[in-house]
Amino acid sequence: MADQQLPDSARVVVIGGGIIGCSVAYHLAEEGCDVVLLERDQLTSGTTWHAAGLLTNFGSGSETLLDIRKHARNLYDRLEHETGQQTGFVGSGFIELATDEDRVEEYRRIAAFNRLHGNDIHELSAAEIKDLFPLADVDDIKAGFYAEHDGRINPVDVTMAMAKGARMKGAKLIEKTP
């Protein structure tokens, strides 16, 4: 349940109770900051519930992006443990498809970079893709790059877990504040 009374003061005021606002409130509260989050309607009532929630490592061509993606994956596990609130993670895997040789070479470089940094990416032939995904039309596919441990989260569940975690760490979250 949302806190209903506006405090007289706060060190930080976060505007918006979507996944970004709740993440900011969570992380600042974790650092001991006095945080108030104001949401004009209800948590997740804006664009958060429209998000796809893809959680992938493949495609990262920089160490910084890989670090951010690894942090996110670890955060979702930690949130579930800390709050008891599910994040909706489903480890469905992720596959990137290449339809021409230039793309195959580009994805091979990305896959090698990812493997160098501990991400398990497998190059698959069209036949192997068909074995994994029998309904796939692989006629134009040159190769696929499969990240078995990737998947998706439920953005609403993650937001609610972050909100709960933020409250547990002392943040005030106030809804219905137009």
Predicted regions located by residue number:
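Beta1/beta-strand and adjacent pyrophosphate-binding region of the FAD-binding site
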Residues: Q4-I20, V36
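Gly/Ala-rich phosphate-binding loop of Rossmann-like dinucleotide-binding domains
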Residues: A25, A29, G165
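Glycine-rich FAD pyrophosphate-binding loop
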Residues: A29-W49
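Short phosphate-binding/catalytic loops that engage adenosine nucleotides
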Residues: C33, N119, A171
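Short loop/edge segments at beta-strand edges and connector loops
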Residues: E39, S125-A126, E175-T177
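Dinucleotide-binding Rossmann-like beta1-alpha1 core, especially the glycine-rich loop
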Residues: G53-L132
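Helical element adjacent to the flavin cofactor pocket in flavoenzyme catalytic cores
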Residues: Y146-P178
